[in-house]
Amino acid sequence: MLKNLKDLTLEDMKVKRLTLKKEYMDLRFKTVVGHVENPLKKRELRRDIARLNTIIHEYAIGIRKV
């Protein structure tokens, strides 16, 4: 996943973050209802969202350049 993130533009990262958040919320709902095929997917999504947040924040504070 990390190799793919470095190739994305900042706007693409923001869109990807929104889609991952939506997917994470859907998975959380399915967990509450009681039917999840892969419970580890929730952890993977949460970590991918955190990675994206970190990279987006690095652009915002100037560590990474556009």
From Swiss-Prot:
- What Gene Ontology terms for biological process does this UniProt record contain? translation
Recorded GO CC terms: ribonucleoprotein complex; ribosome
State the name under which the record lists this protein: Large ribosomal subunit protein uL29
Similarity comment: Belongs to the universal ribosomal protein uL29 family.
NCBIfam families, A to Z: L29
Alphabetized, the UniProt keywords read:
Ribonucleoprotein, Ribosomal protein
Q: Does the keyword Disulfide bond apply?
A: no
Q: Which InterPro entries would you find in this protein's record?
A: Ribosomal_uL29, Ribosomal_uL29_sf
Q: Which residues form each disulfide bond in the chain?
A: none
**Mind listing the GO molecular function terms for this protein?**
structural constituent of ribosome
Q: Does the keyword Transmembrane apply?
A: no
Pfam families, sorted: Ribosomal_L29 (PF00831)
